[in-house]
Amino acid sequence: MLSKRSDKELSGRSCSCDELITLVAERMNRCAPFACFRLPGEGCAVHEIGLQHEARAVATTARELREREHLAGFLMAPFVVTAETPMLWIEEEQKEQGASVLELATCDEAELESFPPVAPIPQALPDSYRVTFARFIEHLEEGMAEKLVLAHRAELPSIATAQVVGAFDKALTHYPNAFVSLCYTPQSGLWLCATPEMLLRGDGMRWQTVALAGTMPRQRDGEPPLWSEKNRREHRYVQRFIGELLEQEGIPYRTLAVETTTTGLLQHLQARFALQLPEGYAPITLAERLHPTPAICGTPQRVAQRLILEEESAERSYYAGFLGWYEPERCVDLFVQIRCLQLLPEQSLRLYAGGGIVRGSSLESEWQEVLHKLSAIHSLIR
């Protein structure tokens, strides 16, 4: 385990939820980029960049990040880089070491309840999902891949920016062990994320990544989860992929025991990898090699990614990409962007979720898993 930030590092000025709503609205009205995020286990200590001081957002590449020195900023990468969805880098115009910290006070529930209720998630299985599922099964049975992750997005009308900020605040308490972020750039729009899945974390000496896969609804207290063979197989794919990649890269590691982790309404299987990066090895290089893992893409990695791009009916954009703080000389905290939503320019909401498909997968069971995942993020705003 990496150590948490020290009390001194986490000390910052207090900020009410109303003040955060005002700051976010003002920045978005000016198309001014910002990111605020809470690391797992850090309560309501919210790191921010661009809210108290001016920041800029630029398109970048892993190569550019490797070549620059003294980096300190927020990184948001898409599932696949395109002209419309570049890798984005947010940094303050007047550079200071690290991000500022806000101690966020809880939102006024009565004020948030004054907004119209958010529309429910459509429950009917859409034809687009049914068709792509059938195509994925064909590819799996033909032996082109062992696993393919099928994504779905649900669009809901009429939501206020304040409700998304309120959902961010709610996620801080409902998802204490998740990476929770609220990020805006003119290129990407506003994204809220409450993800359980780490991509890469480290402080220069100690590094770790995680194999996280398999999903089931949270069990009642005291009841041990009964993981299906399908879930265990999905998790083994991720474990195998990470282990083989680390060996190829010449990175020493050890794997910790598989355990069940709970985030909000859902449980997952996870196994942590403790790493030692060789001297001169840039963290962004490993992040780039790991992404996209079988947990959000499939296996083999590049074959699965190609099939997803060919078959899925809607683009993933920044869903199933990765994001977080990147300051390689001091600390790196990168996470996979799942359990997320996007506020669209017309104030409608787009929720994203996906599930792993293997040979023998059931269409109805997979659709129910997608609904469970959509409900997990939807529960923060309804």
Per-region residue spans from a language model:
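A short glycine-rich, hydrophobically flanked beta-strand micro-motif that places a catalytic Asp/Glu
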Residues: 73-76, 148, 180-183, 316-324
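Residue-level signal for inorganic ion chemistry
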Residues: 143, 200, 240, 304, ...
